[in-house]
């Protein structure tokens, strides 16, 4: 046990000596490799290029190791100098490393700083623009009004672009006062014509709630056709917009027929049985009616005595016993003659072939020329001069226009001038605007106008309030506009300023509702201009400019009611442009000749 204790320290000492020798040998071998690599770089590169070289034998490696030791002993005097140089080089390298680390740490910061400097102007640009805009807005009250107006113009232009690119549903939400011709719903249609009705006004917006009991109906028929007799639970005011017609009104004690031409109008009381003939051989008939339902607001029904594929006879709603007692005839006979019998014999079909074909056609049927002549034999023409009668038709252009100049004509029949429209409180207007002309801005004091495009194309601008539920000081003005074409309809609420621009010869038909004592107030023009009638002092207090400047501006427009839609400045620029081009051409010709 004592011997083991003595040998253990000795063993540890020997192991330490061996470890130190191994370390010294490894260091010497590493330095030898460094020297060898400096002296023989070509051999090293060759070894790296050929990694597939076979490993050398162990005794050969031992010989090479001995050879290296001998060379190291031969170079022993210069080894100290080399080690000192290497130590100095290591010190220099140690001093360089902290500097490199600092540079590497600073390099990303410089990159980020450069990126921040690069992005900083971009962030500052909007801020500088806002500051400049605020400075410009703060320069004067007029510039503030102008910038607010420009912002509103830009917003409304974006809304109009979205309106033109969107579908009809989204467009309806932005402009509830405009109804395209696609908003009509077809009631009846066959090869001879069609009857359709516009959707309800109050379904579009609450702002048209007062129009819930008014509907627009349109029917068209081909030449030599007849719309079968019917009556309705609504009052009608009908207007012929295209072609000619013969309408027959049937009362319990008499029957009256009238020949109607383009522009003729007629009141058709509720419950009156009537039928309309298109007697022309070539021209289609187009009639528009304003319907005022009696029983249910916004809903009306047509009642036909005949049965066809489109509707049933109102006789079919009675019981068999009631019909037999009413006509004092067997039910089978009533069914065969009035209602139609599906079990008719073949000889009966041949005998009544014409009546059967009319049932197959529907509501609008064809008639022969002989039948046309018979139906028009006792018809009267409309009254084109003098006061309208209490029951007969009247023409919208029978009297002189109330507004007229070289740019357009404005015809109107008011309730106090027409007994047929007096109890309905309806007025009728017919407007003709020449191509390139403008109906100057105006508003109606109490009447709501429903306007239909009869012919041509144009556009309108209606000024309203964006949110009518806000307080007065928070209300914001909005412009509602739309491109108009034939068949389109738009509504002009009372008090809302409007202007209409014609891009082609434009014809409009208007129904004025709540029209009694309505007054039309123009906002520009020489006559009937309410702005012109303001006191001079009030003009200066109302507008940003001085009173004399306001008066001079108002007097610039010498026309009344209708004017040229092209601004005077633009016309002058175009004239100058044409004159400039002409002078340029003359100068070129003068150099040539």
Curated annotation (Swiss-Prot):
UniProt entry tagged with the keyword Signal: yes
Keyword terms: Allergen, Glycoprotein, Seed storage protein, Signal, Storage protein
Region of interest called Disordered, as start-end residue ranges on this chain: 38-178, 343-365, 377-399
Residues making up the signal peptide according to the UniProt record: 1-30
Domain Cupin type-1: 177-335, 394-551
GO molecular function, one term: nutrient reservoir activity
Glycosylation sites: 242, 501
InterPro entries, per the entry: Cupin_1 (IPR006045), RmlC-like_jellyroll (IPR014710), RmlC_Cupin_sf (IPR011051), Seed_Storage-Functional (IPR050253)
UniProt superkingdom: Eukaryota
Keyword Glycoprotein: yes
Biased composition range(s): Low complexity: 137-146
Ranges of Basic and acidic residues composition bias in the record: 38-105, 147-158, 349-365
Pfam families xref list: Cupin_1
The family this protein is said to belong to: Belongs to the 7S seed storage protein family.
General function of this protein: Seed storage protein. Accumulates during seed development and is hydrolyzed after germination to provide a carbon and nitrogen source for the developing seedling.
Subunit structure comment from the entry: Component of globulins complexes which accumulate in seeds.
Additional comment: The variability of the residues taking part of IgE-binding epitopes might be responsible of the difference in cross-reactivity among legumes.
Protein name, entry field: Conglutin beta 6
Gene field: BETA6
